[in-house]
């Protein structure tokens, strides 16, 4: 407890120590200043001594023999003692008050902890009264050694009542319908009443349906892929007195102005010889 009080109120002890140190330093500095002044400026502190050689020696008195030595030392010690007494007189009551407050707070926390413990005990008693079986000790279960590898048990399929082989069929269930008998040349998967008339093999063809058109007969020297009514005169037709021109050239077609068909092809610039003074 004393250690915790010292750690919590260390600021107070630091202030008291600084006060005591300040008073001590002030008293010692006053003592040193007085010694210096008395030694250097006092005329009464000079003593003449005559030796055997009839020579005079000037010596000063020692500090202890000075008349101000005793009062100065006594005053410095008095200030130090006064600082210690004041520090203890001020600090001790404050520390005692703080310790007393800490003790009261600790007792209060202990009381609160006891009350909480009582409340928890009462709640446990109520739960035990409501369900006494929980308070009984459960028997220890025997330890069973488990295999290292898992064992898979075979599952037995459950038979539903609809799949019972001994169960008789219900009337009208999964019975063939006598009205829908299979027809000749008919797929049994298709209902004959749903057959369209266009798919009846015994039905005659309608006139004009899927019959070749007699008006569009193939012409001589004509591509069968092209409609003859769409052929234009003088288009891609060979001349009877001339040979066939390459690239389907029509001789009856007028030439465009400025276009010479006999003009030779210009040479490729990349195939020309390099000229002098130019980089290749």
Swiss-Prot record:
Biased composition (Low complexity): 132-149, 168-188, 204-224, 235-257
Region listing for 5 X 5 AA repeats of R-P-G-F-N, in residue ranges: 170-260
Polar residues bias: start-end ranges: 114-128, 261-271
Coiled-coil zones: none
Pfam families reported for this sequence: Cytadhesin_P30
Gene Ontology cellular-component annotations: attachment organelle membrane; cell projection; plasma membrane
Repeat region (Sequence), residues: 163-168, 170-174, 186-190, 191-195, 196-200, 199-204, 206-210, 222-226, 227-231, 232-236, 249-254, 256-260, 259-264
Listed GO biological process terms: adhesion of symbiont to microvasculature
Segments of this protein annotated with the region Disordered: 114-149, 163-280
Membrane topology per record: Multi-pass membrane protein
General function of this protein: Adhesin necessary for successful cytadherence and virulence.
Protein name: P32 adhesin
Species the sequence originates in: Mycoplasma genitalium (strain ATCC 33530 / DSM 19775 / NCTC 10195 / G37) (Mycoplasmoides genitalium)
């Amino acid at each position: 407890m004393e250690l915790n009080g010292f750690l919590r109120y260390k600021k107070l002890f630091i202030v008291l120590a600084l006060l005591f140190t300040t008073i001590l330093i002030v008293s010692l500095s006053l003592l040193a200043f007085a010694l210096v002044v008395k030694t250097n400026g006092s005329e009464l502190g000079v003593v003449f001594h005559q030796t055997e050689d009839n020579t005079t020696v000037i010596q000063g008195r020692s500090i202890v023999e000075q008349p101000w030595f005793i009062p100065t030392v006594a005053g410095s010690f008095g200030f130090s003692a006064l600082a210690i007494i004041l520090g203890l007189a001020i600090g001790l009551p404050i520390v005692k008050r703080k310790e007393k407050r800490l003790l009261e707070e600790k007792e209060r926390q202990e009381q609160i902890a006891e009350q909480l413990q009582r409340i928890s005990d009462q709640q446990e008693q109520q739960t035990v009264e409501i369900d006494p079986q929980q308070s009984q000790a459960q028997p220890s279960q025997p330890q069973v050694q488990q295999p290292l590898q898992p064992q898979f048990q075979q599952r037995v399929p459950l038979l539903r009542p609809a799949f019972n082989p001994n169960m008789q069929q219900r009337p009208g269930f999964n019975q063939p319908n006598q009205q829908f008998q299979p027809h000749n040349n008919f797929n049994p998967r298709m209902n004959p009443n749903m057959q369209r008339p266009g798919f009846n093999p015994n039905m005659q063809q309608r006139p004009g349906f899927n019959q070749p058109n007699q008006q569009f007969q193939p012409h001589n020297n004509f591509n069968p892929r092209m409609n003859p009514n769409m052929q234009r005169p003088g288009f891609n037709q060979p001349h009877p007195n001339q040979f066939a021109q390459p690239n389907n050239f029509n001789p009856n077609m007028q030439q465009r102005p400025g276009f010479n068909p006999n003009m030779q092809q210009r040479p490729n610039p990349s195939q020309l010889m390099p000229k002098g003074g130019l980089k290749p």
